[in-house]
Amino acid sequence: MQRSPVEDANCLSRYFFWWTNPIMRKGFKEKLRPSDVYQAPSQDAADILAERLEKEWDREVASGKKKPSLLRAMARCYIKPFLLFGFLLYIGEATKTVQPQLLGRIIASFDPAHEPERANGYFLAFGLGLLFTARFLLLQPAMFGLHHLGMQIRIALFSIIYKKTLKLSSRVLDKISTGQLVSLMSANLGKFDQSLGMAHFIWISPLQCILCTGLIWELIDVNSFCALAAISLLGVLQAFLSHKMGPYKAQKVLLTNKRLALTSEIMENLHSVKAYGWEEIMETLIKNIRQDEVKLTRKIGSLRYFYSSAYFFSAIFVIVAAVVPHALSRGINLRRIFTTLSYCMVLRMTVTRQLPGSIQMWYDTMRLIWKIEEFLSKEEYKLMEYDLSITELELQDVTASWDEGPGELLERIKQENKANGHHNGDAGLFFTNLYVAPVLKDISLKLKKGEMLAVTGSMGSGKSSLLMTILGELVPSSGKIRHSGRISYSSQTAWIMPGTIRDNILFGLTYDEYRYKSVVKACQLEEDLAALPEKDKTPMAEGGLNLSGGQKARVALARAVYRDADLYLLDAPFTHLDIATEKEIFDKCLCKLMASKTRILVTNKIEHLKRADKILLLHNGESFFYGTFPELQSERPDFSSLLLGLEAYDNISAERRCSILTETLHRVSVDESAGMQPERSAFRQVPPTKPMYIDERKASVIVNPLGVARKASFIQVPEEEVRRTLPDRKFSLVPENELVDESFMGSDVYHNHGVHMAGQRRQSVLAFMTNAQGQGRREHLQSSFRRRLSVVPQSELASELDIYTRRLSDSTYDMTGILEEENIEACLTDEIDEIEETFETTKWNTYVRYVSNNKSLLYVLIFILFIAAIEIAGSVAGIFLITDELWREEHQRSEPNMTKHSNASSSGQTYAITVTPTSSYYILYIYVATSESLLAMGFFRGLPFVHTTITISKKLHQKMLHAVLSAPMSVLNTMKTGRIMNRFTKDMATIDDMLPLLMFDFVQLTVVVVGCILVVSIVRPYIFLAATPLAIIFIVMRKYFLRTGQQLKQLETEARSPIFSHLIMSLKGLWTIRAFERQAYFEALFHKTLNTHTATWFLYLSTLRWFLFRADILFVFFFTLAAWIAVGTNQDKPGEIGIIICLAMLILGTFQWCVATSIAVDGMMRSVDRVFKFIDLPSETPKPDKGKDSDLIIENVDAQADSSWPHRGQIEVRNLTVKYTEAGHAVLKNLSFSAEGRQRVGILGRTGSGKSSLFNALLKLVYTDGEISIDGVNWNKMPLQKWRKAFGVVPQKVFIFTGPLRMNLDPYGCHSDEELWRVAEEVGLKTVIEQFPDKLDFQLEYGGYVLSNGHKQLICLARSILSGARILLLDEPSAHLDPVTIKVLKKTLRQSFSTCTILLSEHKVEPLLECQSFLMMDKGQVKTYDSIQKLLNETSHLKQAISPAERLKLFPRRNSSMRTPQSKLSSVTQTLQEEAEDNIQDTRL
């Protein structure tokens, strides 16, 4: 970016915005790029603004006042410019009260009694033009200054909120949601930019009302209060309508949230939706929700229409209430009438627009400031006291709990009870039932420099919490921790920040080439970096989406190792690595490169325990064992023999190792507890022995397993019962036997902060950071990286995508809190629209197509314009009648009569042109002519317009949804899910809520302005001649501005997204950031993103003001010309002069509003244009021509007639070539094979060999060339939906949508309950479903998070059985399954699918051993297709397809059933093995 010209611009250039001329010219001629945008002015730099406000806030906190005031801190920073701009605004508004006086003097100058003063009319008209000039010369800089000041306040608040976020303690992070934080910084703080311009009207409007009422009193006496009462009544009506809209908005938010949640699930699982052939039912589900949403949208739209129309219809109320009675009682005095009407125009704008807007602005602002004050006052992360002189690590009797809120509350209540004299009674009972369970209890250890401690233990035993305690994230309630303070940390879930791989490893540190290369080599990253197109400078996508899970884990480990620290905390860094890579890193990195460093490694592998200097074994937060491995063998022989005796313990999955370890520790601890009572810390109070509400608690655990608490509990639940109901978790901060009542989910034990709304619960920031809410909610975003990068194989990438994107959508659609989160999607979605091909404004064909979607809208517009033309014609006719009558009566009346009427006035002053009662017939004509432009649209003409546009919105949503669901996956794969969701969220919200009323306002204001110009032009044709060139100039100038303005707005939108992406990214890696002490580095990055956005936003505001400034100049010039022409061509008809000048003043007052509305409508029509682009997406099943229809029917007659097709399931593939995009490279090349009916074919190959691509080709989800036939029927001769329904699919990524379990099994409702229960029993789900409160009608949420991965796979099997599919496709079903569920899966395949053809894709050998034939693939080609016996001899092919670790397991596994158990196994081991065999069908939550 180049330096902004405003920095060197002189005063005139800044005042008239001449400095924007270069960017305006460039934007008009060519497309603007981000590099074309000027830098933000130095005064708007985020660091400067943040430092200034933070200084004042710290001063406020240090003042010692009971409650620090953010408003006072902001006032000390910004009060001077705020008051200065307010003063300019008041002077500019005050000129409006002088304008009617000059209008009255102009009319009075044409009084026959003041004929010598008629020459002053030119000067008075010129003075009126000067007043308008002075007004916009004051208002334009004032409004720009207020908007600029609002921008500065927003930037400063953004910065201090972000800085506070980096300081929040983990306990606080567990009480607030990510959605709340983002909503605070987006939907709320964004209001400062625009709404600050309304702030001063809170005091300007009352003053203006008083002044106008007093001046009207001088004109029409007591009737002035009637005018004020009439307009005030409209203000009360607006307040009532606003109040009525509240409940409707709340209901609409819930429905919108429900629709968007379901839409998000479908869009993120489009692959599965198409594979199952569920497009129609998914479309119906969303359509039903949308129907109810549109009904509420219509009600809200109607209320908004009446609210908006109050301004336009206010003139008629004033006329009826004040002007008409005065005219009927005292005759028509033109000076009084026109002056009064001019004041009433000022008054109606003040009462119906400015004052309500200002009150609403202050109400919203104060609520926002209070929220920010509360947020800034929250508890901060406290740095522990370190001793840099020591080199060892020591923990002494450390006890800690993640949430001591209930304990603190108890202490407070105890103190209050003591103060009140209550020592017993109910309070005592309360205390006996409430206890806090620490996550760590009396942990002691000591490590010398260079030693390695291996921490292992059961699930939820406190391993990660121990590391958090050492980091200082978890503050111990008792005990001491001593270490040097220089710590490096690698989190359990690899965290990748946006940037290059080198940036992620260096993490803001200086580059040391030797150290960097050593770390990369030790972490086994050399080959991966060499395969990347830009090596270690390859940019990472959000969350590292273009890296596999193992690659991300190694990058995160390299970051921790690169930092030179005294203590390294490594939280399960090998979770996603294969055995060979893990062994290399452990040897070369942990044991060699870091040999001189103190290391704490969380692991559950025996090999690591053997080589560690010390071992800490945790169970239920307590130290089960601490010492060396030989001491473990001698002191705990039962435990060590158990683990050492298990066959290939280190070779099974990490989840399974943890499960076995948990069961072992549980059994051993139970055996020990029979002989001795373990000591308990005084921290936990003994709970009551009698269980309370066990049945209710059991149901609660099933319904909401996320309620597993780290906080407190009212009840005692048997440990075995708790273990049975808890889901497996990779990361847990608490022992699994700790439960909590739902009333303790928030920070206040008296209130239920864990509120469920529409079946959802807000996710805390801590849960977001730790991913503690289970893997069931992990939803993966399929981005364009899936098809573009070759480093990560395609089939692996789908299973390795980070949870980051799904968490964004969770926060986006979480409406359980404040309603401001309704607009959160516009901020959270990281998608940036594709670069527009053109930089023109919205094309006219978009408007035409929008209107043509409902012909009723065209008829409504024609009707509106027709009525407006009739009213204009009637008004013009009335003007001629009035002026002719007045001219005739003026010449017929005698001077004495005129004097008589003049003396009849209450003030005794001679007023201009008092009309006799004989003219009362024409009174209505006068008022209709004056207020014609205000009533042009009428009352009932706007309501059909609003309802018709809402109907169009409904149709657009329906068409877009159908188009997306019907589009081929090859097209959808090139789009991010965020981009698709933006169309259904931000764009549809614009089209639903904002566009109808704004378009109506634009049409209405346009008719007002055009009607006024036509009226004055007809009365004085010379005005039309003067207006024509000015109108042409304005149209050209508008087009000139919009070319640049719309591009800058687009760039601003793109620059806004990284702000919130950075916030979300920082929250996810907050512990890593604080462990590395990189807060200042990330604050600098955040300020950089803020400055980038500020540059585009400030430039957009400046160019917009450039246009409005010149538009005002243009129309002030028009007003002055119109006034001079009216005065110069007058033929003793002061009524015409009054009408012309009044309407010209109305044009000036309405025009800028009309211009701003037109710009806003043009911007919103871009949302319509984007929706049309999605509607125009190609379809998978285009409608064929009639001629082709008949041919198709003839060729498919046999297949169509045979309702049992396919009956055998025979598959034949010939010369199949597959591409994911039409222009992409082939991922499968000339593939040919065949499978007989009922045959089981195993598909073997390395990740990326093309296994998943083959399944996609069979389902016609990709571009294909070649032939596939089932039972002799070619796929080109079969309808797409019927072809896909021939397959049953069990994908890697299981699709569980929000809705009843029954619908997830049988979406079309074709099967009875008996059939569903029978199938559930076949697949082993019956016992699971019976535990649900509503059985088959149990509501599944969040992708079925209450179900394990195994249960979801079984649901897919149940779907396949119910669908009657003859061919079953299983894509790596064992990837996330435990051994028990794998056995259930195998048994189901043998029994329920014995008559089906099965294609099983795996990269592991064991699940494939029961297959009859094997298709071995490599690099998209068939290497071998034969039996397992022959493949075992093809060692060269096996080496290419199977990893070394799996190759080691192949031969022992072949004859595992023939081996006898080793005699060394203890009875505990035998019991475990027997349970695994006996309880195959017992799948538990």
From Swiss-Prot:
Map motif PDZ-binding onto the chain: 1483-1485
From the Swiss-Prot or TrEMBL record, state where the protein is found. Answer: Apical cell membrane; Early endosome membrane; Cell membrane; Recycling endosome membrane
Q: Is Kinase a UniProt keyword of this protein?
A: no
GO cellular component, alphabetical, reads: apical plasma membrane; chloride channel complex; cytosol; early endosome membrane; endoplasmic reticulum membrane; membrane; plasma membrane; recycling endosome membrane
- Compositionally biased spans, kind Polar residues: 1454-1473
The record lists the membrane-crossing segments as: 79-99, 124-149, 196-216, 225-245, 300-320, 341-363, 857-877, 925-946, 997-1019, 1022-1042, 1104-1124, 1139-1159
Which CDD domains does the record cross-reference, listed alphabetically?
Answer: ABC_6TM_CFTR_D1, ABC_6TM_CFTR_D2, ABCC_CFTR2
List the SMART domains hit by this protein, alphabetically: AAA
Q: Which pairs of Cys residues are joined through disulfide bonds in the record?
A: none
SUPFAM superfamilies recorded = ABC transporter transmembrane region, P-loop containing nucleoside triphosphate hydrolases
Q: How is it modified after translation?
A: Phosphorylated; this activates the channel. Dephosphorylation strongly decreases ATPase activity. Phosphorylation at PKA sites activates the channel. Phosphorylation at PKC sites enhances the response to phosphorylation by PKA.
Annotated stretches, region: Disordered: 1452-1485
In terms of InterPro entries, this protein maps to: AAA+_ATPase (IPR003593), ABC1_TM_dom (IPR011527), ABC1_TM_sf (IPR036640), ABC_transporter-like_ATP-bd (IPR003439), ABC_transporter-like_CS (IPR017871), ABC_transporter_C-like (IPR050173), CFTR/ABCC7 (IPR009147), CFTR_reg_dom (IPR025837)
Q: What is its EC number?
A: 5.6.1.6
Report biased composition (Acidic residues) as residue ranges.
1474-1485
Task: Give ranges for the Cytoplasmic compartment.
Answer: 1-78, 150-195, 246-299, 364-856, 947-996, 1043-1103, 1160-1485
**Which residues lie within the region annotated Disordered R region?**
653-826
Could you say which residues bind ATP 2 here? Y1220, G1245, R1246, T1247, G1248, S1249, G1250, K1251, S1252
Write out the tissue specificity statement of the associated record: Detected in gut epithelium (at protein level). Detected in kidney, spleen, intestine and liver. Detected in pancreatic duct epithelium at 5 dpf and throughout adult life.
Q: What is its main location?
A: membrane
Q: How is the quaternary structure described?
A: Monomer; does not require oligomerization for channel activity. Interacts with cse1l; this interaction may down-regulate cftr activity.
Q: Which family does it belong to?
A: Belongs to the ABC transporter superfamily. ABCC family. CFTR transporter (TC 3.A.1.202) subfamily.
Q: Please give the record's comment on domains.
A: Binds and hydrolyzes ATP via the two cytoplasmic ABC transporter nucleotide-binding domains. The two ATP-binding domains interact with each other, forming a head-to-tail dimer. Normal ATPase activity requires interaction between the two domains. The first ABC transporter nucleotide-binding domain has no ATPase activity by itself.
Chain's role: Epithelial ion channel that plays an important role in the regulation of epithelial ion and water transport and fluid homeostasis. Mediates the transport of chloride ions across the cell membrane. Possesses an intrinsic ATPase activity and utilizes ATP to gate its channel; the passive flow of anions through the channel is gated by cycles of ATP binding and hydrolysis by the ATP-binding domains. The ion channel is also permeable to HCO(3)(-); selectivity depends on the extracellular chloride concentration.
Recite the other comments. Mutations that lead to the production of a severely truncated protein that ends before the start of the fourth transmembrane domain disrupt normal left-right body patterning during embryogenesis and abolish lumen expansion of Kupffer's vesicle.
Q: How is this protein named in the record?
A: Cystic fibrosis transmembrane conductance regulator
Q: Which organism is it from?
A: Danio rerio (Zebrafish)
Lineage from the top down? Eukaryota, Metazoa, Chordata, Craniata, Vertebrata
